[in-house]
Amino acid sequence: MNGLRIKKEAAALLAFLCALVFAGCTGGGDTSSDTVLVNAKAEKFKEFRVEKFNLKFSTPDDWQEDNKDTELDWYCENSSVGMGIFGYYRSDFADSANVTDILSQQSKDNMERYQNVQKVEHTPEFVSTDKKITAELYSAEYEGAKIYQYFCYVEFKENDEFFWVTFSSQPSYMKKNFKMLEKIIDSFEIEKGGEK
């Protein structure tokens, strides 16, 4: 699978970045007020662009880009959740390649560094008409903390690009914010006129 950009080093870096986010989340005390603040800010969104793939999407206003020292195509976060993106081109794979299988393998490779990995039942509420979105939710443990890894596979019906997206956070945050995370994924759009 030479064409497949499964980067174990990048997945390890993502795990490290997630650990930093989790460390900030577990500073002790009640974090419910933090979650309320995040939800309150979720009303105001800002736009990000991943120019390499002509991708644009929106996140809540408190999210920040953090693409230093990462092999991911994009990484951003707020104080409670990290989001990583790998982009691919369908034309770089054999016609017989299954996009979902490619993206699922990326998720499996990413989960290798965690302990007690379990798939969690979750029914996303995507209503997209211009793309196919597949989601998988996993519970795991990392450095003594329980985390959720929420993987979303985004395939555009009319475009060559497709994406592997992961959200990493504590279960308590994730359970309260699935709709907001899914709104981010549903905002994915390919801008016309860009170059490959």
For each feature predicted by the language model, list its residue ranges.
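N-terminal targeting sequences that direct proteins away from the cytosol to non-cytosolic compartments
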Residues: 2-77, 145-146, 168-196
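Conserved polar/disulfide-associated segments of primarily extracytoplasmic proteins
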Residues: 69-164
